Amino acid sequence: MRHGGGDNERVYVAALILLAVLLGWPIPRLLPRVTVLRAAPAAAILLWQSVSLAAIAAGLLAAPLAVLVQARASSGQHDPEPGQHLPLLVAGLAVTAFVAGRLLLKAHLVGTDLRRGRREHTELVDLIGVDDPTLGEHVKVLTHPTQTAYCVPGSRKRVVLTKGTLDALDADQVAAVLAHERAHLRQRHDLVLEFFTVLHTAVPTWIRSTAGMGEVKLLIELLADRWAATVVGRRPLATAMLALASGSHPTSALGAGDDAVVRIEQLAVGDRHRNRVIVAAVLASVAVLQLPILLMVATLVS
C-alpha cells in the first residue's frame, strides 16, 4: 500500500466534491454579476453550459470515486480483489444512477410539458389569429389592443403579433420585431432554454439560482437582438423594444420585449470588448470542462 498515493486520492476526491458544490451553488449566483459577458452572448451561453456540464460530471463522479478510494484504503492494497467491497461500490454507483436518473426524468417531463404547451398554444393561435401576407410565413396576428410580440417554437412554429403592436410600430420597427423572433426560431434558442430549464428544475429548490436562470434568458434575447440588428439596424430594434417593454407572452414562448432596458444598453455598446470577451469565455469554458476529467484521472492513477 502507498500511503502517499492514498492521501492524494482523498485530496482529489475532496477537490471533485468541492468543484461540484462550487459549480452548482455559488458560481451560478455570481456569474450574472459579470455583466461584461453580455457583450458576447453566444460565448457567454457556452460558458454557462460548460459550468452546468462540469457540475453534473463532478457530481456524478464523486460518489463512485469516493467509494473506490475508501475500498483501496481499507483493503490495504492499491487495487482491491474483484468482488471485494462490492456493496460499497454498488452504493456509490446507485447514488450516481439516482442523480442521472433524476436528470433524465426531469428532461422528459420538462420537454413533454413544453411541447404540449406549445402545441396547444399554436392550435389556439391558428384558431383565433389571422394571416397577413405582408408579414411573411408563419405569422399570426391577434386582434387585441395590447402591444405584444412573441414566437412559439416547434415543428409548427409561429410568430405572433397583436393588432396593437402593428398599430404602434412603423414598418422598420415591425421588421425588427419579426427579425428578432425569427432569429429565435432559426437558431433554435428554445432548445438552449430547455437545457437550462431541465437543470434548474432537477436540483432541490434551495440550490436553484433564479438569477442564473434569468441571466440565461437575457443572453438568449441578446443573441436574437444581435441577429436582428444586422438585418434591420439597431435603432428600429431599440425603439420597438421600448414600445413592447410592457407586453406579456406565454411561458412556453420567447418574447421580444423582455429586459428592454438592459438589451437597449447592449445595443448601444455594440461590439466593444466583444472579441476579448469571446476569447476569455471560450478559454474559461474549456478549462472548467477539463477540471472534473483531470481530477478523475488523477484519482485513478495516483
What does each model-found stretch correspond to?
Residues 11, 15, 48-55, 88-96:
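Alpha-helical transmembrane segments of integral membrane proteins
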